[in-house]
Amino acid sequence: MRVRVSPWALSEMDSEFQTNKTNDIWDVVVIGGGPAGMMTAGGSATRGRKVLILEKNETLGKKLLITGGGRCNLTNNKVDTREMLLHYKGESDFLFSAFSQFSVKDTLDFFHNHGMPTKEESGGRVFPVSDRAQSVLDVLIGIIREKSVKVRSNSPVTDVSIDKTTGLFNIKTKGATFIAHSCVIATGGTSRKE
């Protein structure tokens, strides 16, 4: 399968979006530029936080573009959270807490409110009407860009520690150390064959 990377996905290289500053103290540093990382960063920035995403790849959302055969199965439209979680073996306790905070309806409303219509297919699977994962990525990158989230790509994190004196996080990459009040690890999981 060929994956097309849109100009939006490469826009983190733009000077106003990409950062090389290492001496700033960030409110939030998010490790991982996948969907969870971008949602976390966008939500934090919406609340007025100064946010940095550290991404190991050159572009954000790289694995997102191949999910669902390149179509991106956003969610499962089973209205009852407990029923939906039957489809996720072994992780239901953790996921129940997460889905109780941001439900399937919240997910659908979020994308609809950002101009991305969805459709439901067999088994309650929900996809963008465009049948393109790129549509999902464009929404997420558009939000973090609008909220002035900064991104440092090609920056795999090598260590995270807490300074005992200041209580601040020290997040190290190969080339720099970033300091933050909060650190969110949103590195995602391994890809699986469909």
Predicted regions and their residues:
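Predominantly flavin-linked oxidoreductase catalytic cores and closely associated redox partners
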Residues: 134-135, 139-194
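Phosphate-coordination loops involved in phosphoryl transfer and adenosine-cofactor binding
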Residues: 25, 121, 154
